[in-house]
């Protein structure tokens, strides 16, 4: 490894010019200066690329049409590294634009990596809003439960987030490319890093290598207020974290052979239960509650109105002398509505 290796920063973006600009300003404060930004602009229409070039004129821009998503964008970055014949001893850093980091971020990453070969290092995260640690970037995926558990224990980790992932170019390319058609967005990072571990690379975290994350800029997760058709469509959207097609492909690609069929059966049982049974009951329950509340309002209103009608108008006039002012106003309101 050279004494001052170059870091190639792969940054997928789409129509977040202000957020991307803030990232570039953060990047320009780095104490380590030997880096090159590869901006993968997937069809932005808000002048993101032009703004980045104003701030960082020597950046490389790869332009897409809006259909690459995360996995496809990283595949474009992968292709660029191969085409440019970037030296294997240099480094590649995958980043999200909705992150912030200290001025020694790049320097800290290189310092950690110089003692670790055949390694993928991912930045641990903290919440930009609260300032508290959140999402360590390292996970233990349990096939039995189909759940990805967060963990700081390197011995337990079997996959990583690629948000803030650092590796030598040689190690990064040795894993192979991504699967943008099979896993276009969510799960692409888990699949890639699982494959890396299977090929002998170490998955690593370090407390000195950290980023602040804006967790409000994530994909479709709250589907509770949607109609049933909207709910179905959003579940199958590429932005949906629980997209069943992406999950199926993920299981086929990375699940151990001996439990693959069983896991697929279990997964689709859960999917069908969630999409067609639980959600249907939820919608029925929601409509029942709304209709019940509406019915109660109608009944109460009817009883009140009928109650006022049962009081003779003459008696209402005599009551005015003894009824408190507040009640008189309410009685007058009812009287006006009835008559």
Task: Provide a role label for each language-model segment.
Residues 165-167, 171-176, 182-209:
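A short, conserved alpha-helix in the catalytic core of glycosyltransferases
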Residues 41-50:
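A conserved acidic beta->alpha catalytic loop
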Residues 147-167, 233-237:
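A recurrent flexible, glycine/aromatic-enriched loop bordering the glycosyltransferase active site
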Residues 225-339:
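Non-catalytic, C-terminal membrane-associated alpha-helical segments of glycosyltransferases
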Residues 87-100:
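Short beta-strand-to-loop acidic/aromatic patch adjacent to the donor-nucleotide binding site
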Residues 64-84:
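Glycine-rich, basic loop-to-helix element that forms the pyrophosphate-binding segment
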Residues 25-34:
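Short, acidic, metal-binding catalytic loop of nucleotide-sugar glycosyltransferases
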Residues 100-136:
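Conserved donor NDP-sugar-binding/catalytic core segment of glycosyltransferases
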